[in-house]
Amino acid sequence: MRRWVVRSAGLAVVVALVGIVYGCGGGGGVLTIDRIGKEDAPNTMTLQLNNSYTHQAATPSWADGFERLFTQFAEDHPDWKMELKIIPDDQTTQEQARLLEAARVGRAPDCANVDSFVVPQFIEQGALKPVDQYFTEEEKQDLFPFVSDVVTGDDGKMYAAWWATDLRVLYRRTDLVPEAPRTWDELIEYANAAEQKDSKVDGYLYNGGRWEGTTFDNLAHFWSQGGELVDEEGQPVFGEEPNRTYMLNELNFLKETVDSGASPQRVATIKNYDEFEAAAQAGTVAMFQGGDFQYPPLKESLPPEEFKKWEISFIPTMNPDDPQKTGTGGWTMGAFSDDPEKVKMCMEFTKDVFIGEGNQVTGQLPTSESLFDELPKFKEPIYDTFREGLKEGEARPGVPVYPEISNQIQIAIGTVLTGESTPEEALDEAYKNSLSAYEEQQK
């Protein structure tokens, strides 16, 4: 429970306030640490949520927002109570594997947060229940293409409600880089020119260290060429033509960013988006590849006259006519229960709390085009850019071998950036190890 601080007040006041909002036992309260709805409600559903998407969120505005939404939902559905299991934010990734196993043995919660990345695995296992009937055709058609692709099974049915997403973009200081680079060559040229204008800045920063962001962010360079990581069976194919050439092009481009001086070699150690924000605040970077989610904190942390210098554009590509792909992630809600009433309630909760309202609370991007028009949070012109970028969104392949593919690509990028391996050597090693992992999984 979040601590309530009431200055110049006695303990009784604090207890009273907590009692009003969270309940003090019995059936009176509609919201507690682990329950939404009255304790004596006749119908019960188990609900598993990430901590960030609850009234226990670390961000105060998020906690307050979800407290309001949970309370309203409980009041609107007096016959239902949700027994909450809250997953700590630093365990959400690991929890997906546990959730998949729980579903396999019939012990999954009735309703839960499911990472968009692993939804295809849940569908393939038969863990998720179809939810088509709770969404109109118009609502389903309004989803961005990458969203529909992920949540739709081979049978054409919709199996999860993907409600929040993000994307990767290029941030640049317009006093140093007046025009947005369209190609890799222009990116390197403009980065070097910026360093000539101001010797204190790095021309271009990006994730190059050992973490998922390095693979995911830079896959845009691979996808924009038409690259595929795996085939329809989930087997790695990024080392086979034409994908091999596309991946070599990506690795050679990243190598050139360092070799040319456009990027410092220390990009091989960057594994946190916060480094880009810190560099922007210090005035030591001209361009960086980051996420849409960095726009609000940059706006808040930079003086207005400095923030005005920054603009956002799409990720440059190898050729000027290549589509400007971008990696997209985010969270869904899935229904696991065999009880149709609980599946229905799961989707009612999702639509009342997360779709639209949850985007308003968190600022995370909607997955439906129309919500960009409807929600006040996204009226600022920059969200038109994000909305347009999502049309070229790409989700990671939701196959069991992807984590090892990502790990191997991280290693490959790192060894190329530091000069330990040539792009060819790094790719061959990454592909060999990814295939071995896939073959081991097939046993």
Listing of model-derived features with the role each one plays in the protein:
Residues 133-143, 204-211, 225-249, 300-305, ...:
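Short, solvent-exposed loop/beta-turn-alpha elements that line the ligand-binding surface or hinge
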Residues 109-110, 139-175, 321-325, 392-399:
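A structural signal for short loop-to-beta-strand junctions that line the ligand-binding cleft
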Residues 178, 256, 260-263, 300-365, ...:
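Extracytoplasmic/periplasmic substrate-recognition and gating elements
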Residues 190-191, 235-268:
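Glycine-centered hinge/linker elements that transmit conformational signals in sensory
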